[in-house]
Design a protein with these regions (language model features):
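An aromatic/glycine/proline-enriched structural segment found at the starts
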Residues: 50-65, 88, 93-159, 244-267, ...
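Generic recognition of flexible, low-complexity loop/linker segments
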Residues: 80-84, 138-140, 199-204, 301-307, ...
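A generic structural motif
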Residues: 9, 98-100, 156-160, 216-224, ...
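Short, flexible turn/loop "capping" segments at secondary-structure junctions
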Residues: 83-90, 143-146, 205-210, 310
Length: 372
């Protein structure tokens, strides 16, 4: 602790150290470019609405930092300003795990961290108006791996104040279900998909929005049936609307969460301390340890409200495939701007296409094999 606390009290921020860090950032950026989901994250930020906070939340590289300097921005001054504005006790959380007594640990913390600058106890929130992405767009991204991925994303309101209800966990459970009568089992039986996962990770949760994602790994034949698959996604959602919420699902998830907490395996202490510090930013103090597992209250109206955001006009479609050139003229979309080569910034190809009619109108009648 004695070594790390120096950074928060009196960081050096030497220019030569910053140059080395720029090289490290660029190396990390280039490594991420070999990962399909890192590419997708870059593309989603790049194609979000100008001026929206999401448009700025992406990895930098040497070029982006050099461009900033060429535009008269002093990076060292900006970093020092960031430190002065945000690195103070009012915004920071500390977790210490050790074998010593609590009195000894508290003494060490007060002695070592007592010189950290004090500041107001505030909770930073980013608020914005308007959608993250334009509606009716399909983005095709050239894949690194030999895969075909259909990635669907819906923008939900911030649900942080409802963390005790774990609403998102209920939706992930139902939409990602793999049993008989599920969306997965139906698409799998048709030979269109290899896997289906519905999720909402912590990195997708902010005061701006929660991003609910469905990641579908496609077969070769499934790549040619993208819009039929999307149609069945909405058929399944329509089946859920009158049937959800069902309290027995919540009770089941509540019991599973309790068992996971009671029988949780011991974590590496570094990871555990880091996770608890992060939880201090998200949960009330009494829920810091249990907050990731808790399903405390049942809210029928809230689930119905959030389901209302699962609409075609609130959906972003990304297709990640190494067969991009073969599929760019698929039914329902026309090329809006052709191929856009962004190698100077990102180093990969993507194509934007505009919708000519909503995918939900291609679905036909509800298929009787889909059940909940």
């Amino acid at each position: 602790m004695g070594t790390s606390v120096t950074f928060f009290v009196s960081p050096l921020m030497r220019s030569e150290a910053m140059e080395r860090e720029v090289q490290a950032i660029d190396s990390e950026f280039n490594t991420h470019l070999q990962d399909d989901f890192s590419r997708l994250g870059q593309l989603q930020g790049h194609t979000s609405s100008p001026g929206h906070p999401f448009n700025r939340f992406s990895c930098g590289n040497k070029k982006s930092l050099d461009d900033a300097k060429d535009n008269g921005i002093n990076l060292q001054e900006r970093i020092l300003k960031l430190y002065r504005d945000y690195y103070h006790g009012g915004l920071m959380k500390l977790v210490v795990i050790g074998g010593e007594s609590l009195n000894v640990l508290e003494h060490w913390v007060l002695e070592l961290f007592g010189d950290v600058k004090k500041g107001p106890q505030v909770k930073l929130e980013f608020k914005t108006e308007g959608p993250i992405w334009k509606a009716g767009r399909l983005y095709r991204l050239e894949a690194v791996d030999d895969v075909h991925i259909l990635h669907l994303a819906w923008t939900l309101p911030c649900l942080q104040e409802h963390y005790l209800k774990k609403l998102e966990g209920c939706l992930c459970h139902v939409l990602g279900h793999e049993g008989r009568g599920s969306l997965y089992s139906y698409l799998k039986a048709r030979g269109w998909i290899r896997s289906l996962d519905a999720s909402l990770s912590r990195i997708d949760c902010s005061s701006v929005a929660y991003i609910f994602c469905m990641v579908i790994y496609l077969t070769d034949s499934g790549l040619e049936k993208i819009f039929e698959i999307i149609g069945f996604v909405y058929q399944y959602i329509e089946l859920l609307r009158p049937m959800l919420p069902q309290e027995w699902i919540f009770r089941e998830l509540h019991d599973v969460g309790n068992m996971k907490f009671i029988f949780a395996e011991e974590q590496d202490q570094d990871d555990y301390a880091s996770g608890l510090a992060e939880n201090l930013l998200c949960y009330a103090t009494q829920h810091v340890i249990y907050g990731d597992y808790v399903n405390e209250s049942w809210d029928k109206e809230l689930i119905e409200y959030v389901l209302g955001f699962f609409r075609p006009e609130n959906m972003r479609i990304d297709v990640i495939s190494n067969s991009l050139f073969k599929t760019k003229g698929q039914l329902g979309y026309v090329v809006l701007c052709g191929w856009t080569h962004t190698c100077k910034v990102f180093g990969f190809y993507f194509c934007v296409q505009v919708q000519t009619h909503p995918p939900s109108k291609q679905t036909g009648k509800l298929y009787s094999g889909l059940t909940v």
